Amino acid sequence: MTDSPTAGTPYGTLPPASPLPQRRPVSLPRLAQMREAGEKITMLTAYDATFAAVADAAGVECILVGDSLGMVCQGLPSTVGVTLEHMAYHTASVARGLHRVQGTAWLIADLPYGSYAESREQALRSACQLMQAGAHMVKLEGGGWTAPTVQFLVERGVPVCAHLGLTPQTVHALGGYRVQGKGDQAAQQLRRQALELQDAGAAMLVLEMVPTPLARDLTQALPRCHTIGIGAGSGTAGQVLVMHDMLGINLGKNPKFVHDFMRDAGSVRGAIEAYVQAVKQGRFPDDALHAWN
């Protein structure tokens, strides 16, 4: 058996890549061009080779190997139990899937709980492990206290995506899965943190469960940092969902900000293509249904 990009295996076949002339590798400059042109950025989580390859073939620009794998794949009650070794394993699996189909997606991997808070040096060691596994960028959660770490990583050639609003690694300190940034004081704090992270060099910023007007204002205030919303309304530069949520195959009730794209699509690839088109065309999220004002 050959190891060509579209070779079959005894256990299934990864989807073929589109013709190469139609596929431009996603990069930070390209994401900046998309934003300048007003084109929304699409992102989904993936934790294995097959789902990553299908997402890439369906046109998703960014794939996130999220520490949400702890809840989705491992059955943990939160993301806190996910280790760096878990993240490296799944990142390598996703990277191999993209390689096999000549994928072009930008690959982001979460730095898990306890892998970057001790020191900037610890963060760099952890980031290097994920980059060596195949990530193009690492994501970390936290406010202004992470800005020195972000700057340290960026100066050493590690692209960084920050994460504000609801930060699942600290959900116990936040008092549960609640909307963040409500009220003037909380909104001002989020804005200050976002600007600090942009100044530190963060190229992307996930905004999770943040009121729509605040997320829109932050997006306008961050020209060098692409905002990716999840439960943050339609005014961000892009959107992200957990793959299993948008396919309707989670074990619980979907969060308010999720739409089940599988319900009408009939196939995994069809559902992902529907998600991409809905985001691109401004039909998802619907601020009246999937967000907080």
Curated annotation (Swiss-Prot):
Transmembrane segments: none annotated. It catalyses: 3-methyl-2-oxobutanoate + (6R)-5,10-methylene-5,6,7,8-tetrahydrofolate + H2O = 2-dehydropantoate + (6S)-5,6,7,8-tetrahydrofolate. Keywords: Cytoplasm, Magnesium, Metal-binding, Pantothenate biosynthesis, Transferase. Its EC number is 2.1.2.11. One of its GO terms (molecular function) is magnesium ion binding. GO terms for cellular component: cytoplasm. Pathway: Cofactor biosynthesis; (R)-pantothenate biosynthesis; (R)-pantoate from 3-methyl-2-oxobutanoate: step 1/2. Binds 1 Mg(2+) ion per subunit. It is found in: Cytoplasm. Residues 1-25 are annotated as: Disordered. InterPro entries: Pantoate_hydroxy_MeTrfase, Pyrv/PenolPyrv_kinase-like_dom, Pyrv_kinase-like_dom_sf. CDD domains: KPHMT-like (cd06557). It is an enzyme of class 2 (transferase). Its cofactor is Mg(2+). 3-methyl-2-oxobutanoate binds at D67, S68, D110, K139. One of its GO terms (biological process) is pantothenate biosynthetic process. The active site is at E208 (proton acceptor). Catalyzes the reversible reaction in which hydroxymethyl group from 5,10-methylenetetrahydrofolate is transferred onto alpha-ketoisovalerate to form ketopantoate. Homodecamer; pentamer of dimers. Belongs to the PanB family. This is 3-methyl-2-oxobutanoate hydroxymethyltransferase.
